[in-house]
A protein has these predicted regions:
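Detector for C-terminal structural segments
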Residues: 29-31, 35, 182-185, 215-216, ...
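Extracellular/periplasmic solute-recognition and catalytic clefts
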Residues: 224-235, 259-260, 272-338, 362, ...
Length: 592
């Protein structure tokens, strides 16, 4: 009887909290932002950063990254507390908060649907389903008993979500237990990632192939509208439990914390995301007050600066510039199975190395990034565990050495047209995938100029980003430029791009090297510190020896925001719109 009364009180308190949270999400407060087009709002089928940003407002994981913590720190989200770890690090037990509910869906048949441990069992199973973007081989082998269930779904068979997995089970309604085959120091960060957020099985099954566009989560926002290639609209979740702005003792964050203290979040009732593919229209929309903040780089950043300061007209409006190191690496991968640039022979490696040495990274930083980038000298960017600060940030650009290397391995101009042939006398032509955007046209021109300088003919195949991704997954691109952003401080996702067991979506070059694989697997079992740096350095050395990718730049981020945007912090791993607020009086005074 006492237990029943306590449960009733807990439910009533949860309802009151939800109502209070909804009352604080003001429909008049509309956050206006931009994004390139998104591909999927299914958390287990969303890999690009822009889809991740939107989906992260809708779905919730057991854990999340603290918004303000530096260095990054994992904290509970829907979990009651941090995991209880026993069994020598191999048994993780996690209790869920009670009273969290999914937003309404016809799949729930008019009844409230509480989040339970079984939802995370189902969602983690989806994240290892090989039919969904190839699954997650590393996680599959980490969870005890998962491999046979995953293998039974190959090739093309449906994943059996009812098949028990010994290492993944709900031991009661609110308790999840994960049993591991080995210690893995990245698991906690994985549990804070989008692919481990909770979906409801009945929603997924009802939506079928439309699940990418029918998201139903427990997060602070829910999808109201999605017009492809036009806009996405989110509205505050009326059932959200509400939260307080994070605390911090860092001196540079004190004014921010004080301004947000006491507010129940989310404060913003509606988020309007305009799909804008080009940076110049993005900047124009911001300048006209149609966007509340905007990220800029390269020439577009130079359009708003005089030297290193904002132009007077922007400064007079109170626009703030935030500059920060972004855990991003930009690279061009080589398809290791391509007959021209692929392979592991000395001549094939020499060709890739010469191409990498022939591209002027410093010039690309000046021309394309307005100086706001760093030459990538290793796989992991600054701010990520494993990055070696002792390595000088410089590129390997050396066109004379590139030409000499090509000559040495028989790539010579046999017909006098200024372009080299292969050692067996066949035409040598590089083909890069590229996008129909102004930035990429400049990038393509730089590539062609640099390759002309070392005597290699280069052509491009121009498609939309989605089409290029599909071609990449099918192994039909010779070369393609990609940007990978580490979504957690361990950097394992970036290192995973050269792990041979990753699906093509995760390892687009299809690089395979046993030494690299061993170093990567050891990295997962090594805590943050010097050991990780040593292993990451080893993987970088292996990648530079075989050159499956040409490393280009590390990112520097720049965000401009109007003074009515409150709560903004350039959190590299914990950013969420739920922490923001809009000062309507300031916006009205500015006439925006």
């Amino acid at each position: 009887m006492v237990t029943a009364i306590l449960r009733a009180v807990a439910v009533a308190a949860a309802v009151c909290l939800s109502l209070a949270a909804h009352a604080h999400a003001d429909p008049a407060k509309v956050l206006r932002v931009s994004s390139k087009d998104i591909a999927s709002l299914d958390p287990q089928q969303g890999t690009d950063l822009r889809s991740t940003r939107v989906a992260s407002a809708i779905f919730e994981g057991l854990y999340q990254f603290d918004y303000l913590a530096e260095p990054a720190k994992v904290v509970p989200n829907t979990a009651e507390a941090m995991p209880v770890i026993t069994g020598g690090g191999k048994v993780w037990t996690i209790k869920l908060l009670r009273g969290i509910h999914f937003t309404d869906s016809p799949a729930f048949k008019g009844k409230p649907r509480e989040l339970v441990a079984e939802d995370y069992v189902y969602s983690i199973k989806r994240s290892i389903d090989p039919n969904l973007l190839g699954g997650d081989p590393a996680l599959t082998d980490l969870i005890e008993g998962a491999r046979p269930v995953v293998d039974a779904a190959r090739p093309g068979a449906k994943f059996d979500f009812d098949a028990p997995i010994a290492g993944l089970r709900a031991i009661d309604r609110y308790t999840l237990q994960i049993r591991l085959t080995s210690v893995d120091y990245t698991l906690l960060e994985r549990l804070a990632g989008l692919s481990m957020t909770a979906v409801a099985r009945e929603v997924v099954e009802a939506a079928g192939n439309d699940i990418k566009s029918q998201p139903v989560g427990t997060g602070p926002y829910m999808l109201k509208e999605w017009k492809r290639a036009s806009r996405v609209v989110l509205e505050a979740n009326p059932n959200y439990r509400g939260l307080q702005f994070p605390e911090s003792t860092a001196p540079r964050q004190q004014a921010l914390v004080q301004s947000m203290r006491g507010k129940t979040l989310p404060q913003i009732g509606r988020i309007e995301i305009s799909i804008i593919e080009e940076p110049l229209p993005d900047l124009l929309a911001f300048s006209q007050g149609n966007l509340d903040y905007v990220g800029l780089a390269g020439d577009d950043l130079n359009r708003v600066l005089v030297g290193s300061e904002l132009k007077p007209e922007l400064a007079r409006m109170g626009v703030v510039r935030m500059r920060y190191s972004a855990p991003t690496i930009i690279f061009t991968y080589f398809n290791m199975k391509d007959p021209v640039v692929g392979g592991y022979s000395q001549a094939q490696i020499a060709l890739r190395r010469a191409i990498a040495m022939g591209f002027n990274v410093e010039e690309s930083i000046r021309v394309l990034y307005g100086g706001e980038a760093l030459p990538a000298n290793q796989l992991l960017p600054p701010g990520v565990d494993g990055h070696d600060d002792s390595l000088p940030p410089k590129s390997i650009y050396d066109p004379a050495a590139a030409r000499a290397l090509l000559d040495r391995f028989g790539f010579k101009d046999l017909d006098g047209d200024g372009y080299r042939e292969t050692p067996d006398g066949k035409p040598l032509t590089l083909v890069r995938g590229t996008l129909p955007e102004s930035w990429f046209r400049e990038f393509d021109a730089l590539w062609k100029k640099n390759m002309d300088a070392i005597g290699i003919r280069m052509e491009v195949v121009q498609r939309t980003f989605g089409e290029l991704l599909n071609m990449s997954r099918a192994g039909k691109l010779m070369m393609f430029n990609l940007a990978y952003r580490s979504l957690d401080p361990s950097g394992y996702e970036i290192l995973q791009t050269l792990w041979s067991h990753s699906p093509v979506d995760g390892n687009p070059s299809q690089f395979a090297n046993a030494d690299y694989d061993r170093a990567y697997e050891q990295f997962l079992q090594t805590p943050a510190g010097p050991g990780r740096v040593t292993l990451a350095r080893r993987m970088s050395d292996i990648s530079q020896a075989y050159v499956p990718m040409q490393l280009s730049t590390f990112g520097i981020g720049n965000t401009l925001l109007y003074p009515w945007v409150e709560g903004y912090w350039p959190s590299q791993f914990g950013f969420s719109w739920k922490y923001l607020d809009i000062d309507l009086a300031k916006r009205k005074a500015a006439g925006k």
